[in-house]
Structures are given as structure tokens and as C-alpha cells.
Amino acid sequence: MTQRTAEALDDAAIESFLETQSVGTLSLAKGNESYAVPVAFTFDPDGPDVYFRLGYAPGSRKREFIDATERATFVVAAQTEAGWKSVIARGAPEHRGTVEDLNTHRSADGSMSPADRELAIPFYHVFDAPAETVFALVRLPVDELTGVVEAGPN
């Protein structure tokens, strides 16, 4: 069996990788309990920030975990031609509003704002969503961003 290693990704490689991905895993915590959920996202390298559109259906635990989490971890991983790549982003999640509130966040000069970027988050329907489902926009201001790519044999 061939031994493979991993190499760190630089900022440009991390940004390039995240631009080609649309789903990752958001890990949250409340006390001693953890909660991880696959979510669609968009990445703003200027922050850097990661934006999510989350569905808070009745009985969903995401809202309580977002509210309780002081520091979240978001992981994006994929098999590429070069081998496995992964990026880990960490930060304190914050609510940005509901999808209906987007117009209140637009830049006065009409330039692309974080709210516009949030619109680019794809909707993924995992369940038949009840009519009372509320979608919320969540921002993860990234204070730690790392990435690795699988390297060739030693």
C-alpha cells in the first residue's frame, strides 16, 4: 500500500476550492452536546465569511444550537484529481435575518453586499418542508481558516 501525506493549502488554493463547492458540514455545540448538519453555503473571501441559509422547521434543533454555540466549525471536503481536499473554517455564528429581510441589507450604492452573496446559496430540499418553515441567514465570520490536500507517495 502506498503511503500518502497531506500538504497545507495556501489562501488562494483555499478560496479556489471553496468557490467550486456548495455543501459542507456545520458543527455546533450546546454544553456537552454536539450537533452537525450538512448545509449549503457561499464563501466571501473578503471577510473571510461563510454564509448559510438554514431552515428552522418545527422541531428543528439548528436554531437552539446556533444560539448556544460560541464557536462553530465548518468543514468542506471533496475528492479531487489531486486527491482528497478539505477546508476547515472556525468562528462565532451569527443570525443575519430571514430570507424576507434581504432587501434591508443591500448596499446603498447598489454594489454586491453580503446579502446578495447569500442569495447565491442553493436551496436543498431534504424533506417536504411544511409551510411554516422559516429560513434564516447565518454568517460565520471566520477567524481561523485552514486547508489540506492529499499529496503523492512518500
Model-derived segments and their meaning:
Residues 14, 59-62, 101-105:
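Amphipathic alpha-helical interface surfaces
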Residues 21-57, 74:
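Short beta-strand segments
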Residues 55, 67-76, 85-94:
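Active-site-adjacent structural patch at catalytic or cofactor/ligand-binding sites
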Residues 82-154:
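Charged, gly/pro-rich active-site loop segments
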Residues 25-29, 77, 123-129:
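Short helix-to-loop capping/linker segments positioned immediately adjacent to catalytic or ligand/cofactor-binding
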Residues 1-19:
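Extreme N-terminal tail/first-helix region
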Residues 18, 65-66, 109:
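A generic structural signal for nonpolar/aromatic side chains embedded in well-ordered alpha-helices
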